[in-house]
């Protein structure tokens, strides 16, 4: 069977024969050469060339009966060479966001007669559209997936019409699957899914993600990739963005005013502006490299998780709904919490805070502010406290917890405290006051107490006979002369320097 090239050559040969002057003796009278125009035939096997985004070489066959022919390359991004059968067009990868086009002019000459024809050349962008209107994709794995799922007419290409019906794309790499799966390395071409609402591309090998202008997107999960830059600007309906466990240094959010959930822990962000997001509810940027973050004037924000960064300050204005603030393990020197009337949990441990005023936070239940420089701690009249850990600070003198009757856990060790009043904390189950200057502890009313750690204090007499639920009691490093327990009282984890000081009643 003849191949296409042979068929093309045979057709041209036929044309050439038909155009050849007759040799039967009935030749027309000779015409002067300068008056006789040559009949030039100039044919290509294709007048339109499409080069894929990754680049490559395309050969075009040129057949002519002219005495000579040449070409003019008007394309700056492609190289053209003449071959024995025509021309060879070479282009490198198209890294731009749009298709690029150009023309090559073929000029055939016989005597004074010239014939010109143009070859149109187009190189598609990664994720662009071919001259036939079909969609292209940079990553062959991504392309194979969409073709297997959405090439409804089975022609081996994805049309714009086929892409338009897609609202959900689940591209998550499931490592638990028994079937072998290849990771997707690029989502260039995804913008062709103009009606996409939900996208899950987690667990792949993406290095960048450009979803800008995809106005119908509401949900994106691109976690567990290697993404350094995320662009969702112009995604005006985006509500959920999950991008944790990446390498992101930049997230573009312009126009995302409906954003509700923003979770991007363990990335490389150094700054970000989330201020004035009227619908934002949940913010999690733990374990980044943040030195600056703006999230003021977010009236619906309830949770801000910002631990393990490099923050030195926080602007907490315009956050009336905030009830959980985690800003531990930073370099923060002060916190103004005066506008956070609904705050219930504050985790600000391991910072450089010198004083903390909680008098405006009457709903606060959990406070962990250990490992700071706090010399002044104002707890106010809050009766909602269930946990306070202010250990390893610079507190001194007496601390009175007695009015916080709902307290279940207290940690105040590692301070210069001389007196701790917990006499009315009847719900208390755990008290840790080790390494202080406390000389006595009154715990007889604490019948719910299960753990008491008071190592390295100045306690000489201790009566725990009324604390029948105690399972842990540490009193090492004290000048203890008497420890009174109830008859039959058994403490599973009991540590004292001299067990002879124990008596029972």
Task: Label each residue range with its predicted role.
Residues 2-6, 10, 14-48, 115-135:
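Bacterial Sec-dependent N-terminal signal peptides
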Residues 193-195, 214-217, 235-238, 256-259, ...:
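Leucine-rich repeat
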Residues 187-190, 209-211, 230, 251, ...:
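Canonical leucine-rich repeat
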Residues 29-35, 49-50, 55-60, 77-79, ...:
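N-terminal capping/linker segments that flank leucine-rich repeat
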Residues 204, 225, 246, 267, ...:
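Consensus "Asn ladder" position of solenoid repeat domains
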Residues 97-112:
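A short beta-strand micro-motif common to beta-rich folds, especially ectodomain repeats
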Residues 169-172, 199-201, 218-222, 241-243, ...:
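Conserved hydrophobic beta-strand positions in leucine-rich repeat
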Residues 39-44, 57-90:
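Surface-exposed binding patches on compact interaction domains or structured appendages
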